[in-house]
Amino acid sequence: MTDVTIRELASLAELRDSEDLQRAVWGQDDPADNADLMLAIQHEGGLVAGAFAEDRMLAFLFAFPSALPGVQHSHRLAVLPEARGLRLGSRLKWFQRDWCLAKGITLVRWTYDPIRAINAGLNVRVLGGTSGTYLENYYGTMEGINAGLPSDRLMLDWQLDSPAVVARATGRPVPRIAETRRLPIPADIDGLLLTDPAAALTARMDLRRDLVEAFAAGERIIGFDSTAPAYHLAKSQPGG
């Protein structure tokens, strides 16, 4: 494939192209973020970026300022199915990190579905995000690829200047925490949802119970094992 360029979207036409990309990833029934709204947010300090092979957009990221100084909310990250395997999701996130740090933003937050192993692998294992906040049925009933289960989410904290994130960004060894415990999740929740919807719902509710209890007890997600999918949890450190 032609070399891929990561950059901010530069026109209303590109923003409209991102609507098509969103539908290709999440399904035609899932409402895409509107180009006009993204344009206004971009002009007010938001980030709308894409991964391009020549003039074709292969992946897309949308983030906007939060109510807290130095904190950004990252709302969308989408990669076309045929472009998966090119690490475009992680490349866009590292682009986002550089963009944020240049503007004095040191914390990025976003929600993701904790039962999707591929998302946990990117958000926690690759990027170094952590979480101690569980949001039950956050978006209500959803359509597209998110249909069929309660829309539970984790609020992920990506502390851009933390030792764990800096190590990942620079290719250095990641600091290890000695005492952790594992919490397994399904390897393929989408496949399970197709073959055994009742088992998929049970897996969702079991994970909800386990994470809500863990967070209430002062534990926090600090790692993820992609080979045998499982979260690593540890007690929150003072001030952390």
Regions found by a protein language model. Give the residues of each.
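A conserved beta-strand-loop-helix scaffold within acyl/acetyltransferase catalytic domains
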Residues: 6-81, 222-227
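Conserved acetyl-CoA binding element of GNAT-fold acetyltransferases
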Residues: 70-81, 181-188, 192-195
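Conserved glycine-rich acetyl-CoA-binding loop
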Residues: 80-91, 103
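Conserved catalytic-core motifs of GNAT/GCN5-like acyltransferases
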Residues: 111, 121, 128-146
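C-terminal "cap" of GNAT-fold acetyltransferases
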Residues: 137-169, 235-239
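A conserved acidic, glycine/proline-rich C-terminal tail/linker
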Residues: 197-216
